[in-house]
């Protein structure tokens, strides 16, 4: 049974904590938890523990927070736990080969895509950005490459037309733990089957940047709408009006609508939203956040700032 495995867990954010919680609930033998060092957060910039650390401490699990696993002291902490396997979920630190070789059965990773599609740092966001109709989680053996290890298990999740990165993150956080438990059971029983990735099918999920969140009105409306959902809740798509950034939390595509106006031109502003000409089609903005304000419906924004959204105005 998988509860006989001595497991090291390594992870940092809430997504990882949900997987650790599943291991704890299933009475797995977690012998140590690795997570990133406490970071300053909040208005007071106080040192704040990660969700994984908070959960581990509530269950009296040993916690280790090395700044790096490349140094001997961090590697020694792993070695002294005599683990059978190391489970890595959104840890945020690179595991050198010396660490990958320490557990008897190696290290496995929970990755938020259907590998080999979307290897890399932002698989959830890139799946939305590209218009994929499905994604999922892959449990893989870890090697020295970037998400290149052999695959042990996949769980598929449909992407809905209104999914954001936040909603898709939650969906994957729900299916990932069961996939992990199933994989551990197979490994413990000696029944796990590893499937090599087809490198010819690989795509890469580059890390997000604030710069690419700026809306380029020359793109098609459908692509812009996907960008808005992909960059929610971070870094949030935006445009500029009178040199002030306005964040876009939600938008829709006006099906069948076309415009001969220059991309970025406001075509209309009504209760349905602010209609913008794009490189192909019309985008309707429905939830905005002016600088220094909270996010609000377009109707509320127009009630106070309608003069800023006169048809014919061209947005930056």
Swiss-Prot record:
It is an enzyme of class 2 (transferase). It comes from the Bacteria. (6S)-5,6,7,8-tetrahydrofolate binds at residues 113-116. It catalyses: L-methionyl-tRNA(fMet) + (6R)-10-formyltetrahydrofolate = N-formyl-L-methionyl-tRNA(fMet) + (6S)-5,6,7,8-tetrahydrofolate + H(+). Keywords: Protein biosynthesis, Transferase. One of its GO terms (cellular component) is cytosol. Its EC number is 2.1.2.9. Pfam families: Formyl_trans_C, Formyl_trans_N. One of its GO terms (molecular function) is methionyl-tRNA formyltransferase activity. Belongs to the Fmt family. Attaches a formyl group to the free amino group of methionyl-tRNA(fMet). The formyl group appears to play a dual role in the initiator identity of N-formylmethionyl-tRNA by promoting its recognition by IF2 and preventing the misappropriation of this tRNA by the elongation apparatus. This is Methionyl-tRNA formyltransferase. The lineage of its organism: Bacteria, Pseudomonadati, Pseudomonadota, Gammaproteobacteria, Enterobacterales.
């Amino acid at each position: 049974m998988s509860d006989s495995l001595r497991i090291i867990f390594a992870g940092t954010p809430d997504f990882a904590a949900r997987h650790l919680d599943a291991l704890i609930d299933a009475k797995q033998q977690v012998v140590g938890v690795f997570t990133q060092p406490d970071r300053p957060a909040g208005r007071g910039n106080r040192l704040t523990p990660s969700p994984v650390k908070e959960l581990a401490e509530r269950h009296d699990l040993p916690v280790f927070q090395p700044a790096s696993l490349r140094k001997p002291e961090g590697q020694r902490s792993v070695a002294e736990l005599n683990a059978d396997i190391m489970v890595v979920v959104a840890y945020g630190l690179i595991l050198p080969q010396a660490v990958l070789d320490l557990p008897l059965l190696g290290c496995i990773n929970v990755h938020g895509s259907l590998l080999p599609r979307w290897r890399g740092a932002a698989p959830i966001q890139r799946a939305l950005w590209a218009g994929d109709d499905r994604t999922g989680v892959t449990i893989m053996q870890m090697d020295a490459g970037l998400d290149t290890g052999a695959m042990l298990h996949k769980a598929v999740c449909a992407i809905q037309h209104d999914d954001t990165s936040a909603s898709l993150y939650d969906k994957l956080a729900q299916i990932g733990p069961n996939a992990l438990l199933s994989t551990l059971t197979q490994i413990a029983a000696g029944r796990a089957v590893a499937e090599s990735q087809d490198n010819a099918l690989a795509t890469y999920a580059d890390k997000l940047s604030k710069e690419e969140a700026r809306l380029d009105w020359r793109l098609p409306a459908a692509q812009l709408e996907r960008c808005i959902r992909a960059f929610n809740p971070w870094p949030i798509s935006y445009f500029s009006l009178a040199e002030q950034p306005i964040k876009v939390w939600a938008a829709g595509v006006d099906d069948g609508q076309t415009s001969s106006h220059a991309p970025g031109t406001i075509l209309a502003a009504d209760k349905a939203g602010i209609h913008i000409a794009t490189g192909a089609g019309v985008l309707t903005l429905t939830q905005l956040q002016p600088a220094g304000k909270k996010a609000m419906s377009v109707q509320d924004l127009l009630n106070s700032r309608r003069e800023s959204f006169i048809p014919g105005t061209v947005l930056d």
